Regions:
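N-terminal presequence-like segments and adjacent domain-start helices
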Residues: 1-27, 39-42, 73, 81-93
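Short amphipathic beta-strand starts and helix->beta connectors
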Residues: 28-36
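Short, aliphatic-rich beta-strand segments
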Residues: 45-52
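Short, non-transmembrane amphipathic alpha-helical segments
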Residues: 55-79
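Short, loop-centered acidic/histidine patches that primarily coordinate divalent metals
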Residues: 52-54, 86
Length: 96
């Protein structure tokens, strides 16, 4: 039996987009122009938060890092979180 879901697209890219959107709603202090994406590093997936376009949001995000870790783990978005400004890594948090 074949099921067709015309109301939504079940691709991994769309699933990731929805998960990152949900992440943003749960982390309300994150600036809108902070770039949020996932990257593969060897055998791990890392959640990257790039503050190049919103340096003012980095301080409040660093203060709320425990919340970032909890939400990232809850949604299964990665094994680590990187806070960065462009290509420069500011903080790296490995999730347990």
């Amino acid at each position: 039996m074949s099921y067709q879901h015309s109301s939504f697209d079940c691709t991994s890219a769309n699933f990731e987009k929805a998960a990152l959107s949900h992440f943003r709603t749960l982390v309300a202090f994150l600036p809108d122009n902070c770039r949020v994406y996932r990257q593969t590093w060897e055998f791990s997936t890392v959640l990257c938060l790039d503050f190049l376009a919103c340096l003012e949001g980095l301080a409040i995000t660093r203060q709320n890092c425990a919340h970032l870790v909890n939400v990232t783990q809850e949604l299964g978005l990665g094994q680590a979180i990187i806070l960065k400004v462009g290509n420069k890594i500011i903080e790296w948090h490995r999730l347990s």
